[in-house]
Curated annotation (Swiss-Prot):
Biological processes, Gene Ontology terms: cytoskeleton-dependent intracellular transport; microtubule cytoskeleton organization; negative regulation of microtubule depolymerization; regulation of microtubule cytoskeleton organization
The protein's name in its UniProt record: MAP6 domain-containing protein 1
Region ranges (Disordered): 33-110
Higher taxonomy: Eukaryota, Metazoa, Chordata, Craniata, Vertebrata
Its job: May have microtubule-stabilizing activity.
Origin species: Homo sapiens
Amino acid sequence: MAWPCISRLCCLARRWNQLDRSDVAVPLTLHGYSDLDSEEPGTGGAASRRGQPPAGARDSGRDVPLTQYQRDFGLWTTPAGPKDPPPGRGPGAGGRRGKSSAQSSAPPAPGARGVYVLPIGDADAAAAVTTSYRQEFQAWTGVKPSRSTKTKPARVITTHTSGWDSSPGAGFQVPEVRKKFTPNPSAIFQASAPRILNV
């Protein structure tokens, strides 16, 4: 049999049906299985977690410095309400802002979810000058430099010593290219030139 049975579609379908679905269905917001124990079964997990800050947020009382990754890709939450239209493009003719300014000044609806906003541009230029990656960098010690894979150029031996001839006549010879071979210890015969062996 060329292929094992697991490669057949019927066996694959049977294998996927027998998988433990709890391994696949773990929500991405949980960082450990201890979070599952803290929730009470039967009550809404989303309702109990709504008052808590998101997982990426930090406590203001902590003195732990932010890493460069957290500075670059930190999560800022903004209330999800009606979006402000771009200026000059409000509803109606001529871009008047009669209704749109009233909508944008309204507070967001209670219970609105937070929207993750990525930073645009360089938020703090002072942090970009010296990053934590540069501060934590240590050069590796004890690492050998890699050998170069470049082949050494072959030596070109010319046999003619004539000066600059305008016409390469009978005195012109093609230069010989001799390559220096390294001895091969696994070779049977270490002959410098091909010889005829009497057997």
